[in-house]
Amino acid sequence: MSHLAELVASAKAAISQASDVAALDNVRVEYLGKKGHLTLQMTTLRELPPEERPAAGAVINEAKEQVQQALNARKAELESAALNARLAAETIDVSLPGRRIENGGLHPVTRTIDRIESFFGELGFTVATGPEIEDDYHNFDALNIPGHHPARADHDTFWFDTTRLLRTQTSGVQIRTMKAQQPPIRIIAPGRVYRNDYDQTHTPMFHQMEGLIVDTNISFTNLKGTLHDFLRNFFEEDLQIRFRPSYFPFTEPSAEVDVMGKNGKWLEVLGCGMVHPNVLRNVGIDPEVYSGFAFGMGMERLTMLRYGVTDLRLFFENDLRFLKQFK
C-alpha cells in the first residue's frame, strides 16, 4: 500500500499545481478516470487472496476519496479566485439606463428534440414515454440482455437495488409499447437517460431518442431510406451517409450510421438495426409474421454536430452567454 500512498501524494501535488479548472480536470482523468492510476489499482485485487480483498478495496476507495476531496477543494479555490478576479476587474456605470427584459428562447437540445419529433410526426410516428426509474426486465432482459450477457458491462448503471435502476436507454419504452399493443407500431421515444460517466463528451444525465416500427414486410431497406431522409432533413444538407456493420443485443443485423463532416472525416451519429426476433418473442409478437427496425440517437450529440458545439457540458451549465446564441 506504500505505492498507493505515493499515488495519493502525487495526485495531491498535481492538484495543488493546477492553475485552472481545465488543468484540474486533466488531473482528475489521470488519477480517477476509467484508466486512471488509482482506478487501475482495483484490478490488482484479483491477485490477492479472497479474504484480503475487502480490506484492500476499502483502502483503495479511501485513497480515491482523498483525491476526490482534494479535487473538490482545489476546484472551489480556483472558481473563487476567478470570481474575485472578475469582480475586481468589472465596474458598474450607475448612470446607464435600465435594461429591458429580454424574451427567453428554447434550449438548443429542446430545439433538436422538437425538430426530430416534427420530422417523424410527418411520417406517422407518435411520441411514446415511459418511466425514468426502470426495472432490469424492461431495461435489459426483454431487450435480449440477460443477467449473464457481457453487454451489461457496457452500461455504467445507477442501481437503486438489485432490480431497480435509472434507465440507461429509452428502449424500455419500446418494450412497454409492444406489450400494450399489437402491430402495426410506429413510435419515437424521447427522454432523459442516465449513465455514470462525466467528461467532455459524457454527462451522467443526457437525452436520447429511439424510434421503432413493427409491421409486416419491414426490411433493412425501409430502415436505410427512413434514416437517409431524416439525416438530410436534420442537417439541411445532401450529406454523404454510410452504414457500418455493428452489434447491439436487441437488433440483428445491426449498424452504426456515420455522416461525412466538413473536415472530411466520418462522424458517428446513431445506431440502428432490425428488431431481434428474441425481442419480439419477449413481448408476444410472432417474428414469423412481423418484423421491424429500431434506431437510437443522443440528442446532445446531434445538437453538438448541428451547431458546432465542442463540449457537451455547456448544455447543462445554464450560461446565458452560450444559450443566447440559439435564440
Swiss-Prot record:
The keyword Metal-binding belongs to this UniProt entry's keyword annotation: yes
EC supergroup of this enzyme: ligase
GO CC list: cytoplasm
Major location category of this protein: cytoplasm
PROSITE patterns associated with the record: AA_TRNA_LIGASE_II
Pfam families to which the protein is assigned, alphabetical: Phe_tRNA-synt_N, tRNA-synt_2d
Cofactor annotation: Mg(2+)
Reaction equations catalysed: tRNA(Phe) + L-phenylalanine + ATP = L-phenylalanyl-tRNA(Phe) + AMP + diphosphate + H(+)
Residues at which Mg(2+) binds: E252
GO molecular function: ATP binding; magnesium ion binding; phenylalanine-tRNA ligase activity; tRNA binding
The protein's Enzyme Commission number: 6.1.1.20
Cofactor note: Binds 2 magnesium ions per tetramer.
Binding partners and assembly: Tetramer of two alpha and two beta subunits.
Protein name: Phenylalanine--tRNA ligase alpha subunit
UniProt source species: Shigella boydii serotype 18 (strain CDC 3083-94 / BS512)
Species lineage: Bacteria, Pseudomonadati, Pseudomonadota, Gammaproteobacteria, Enterobacterales
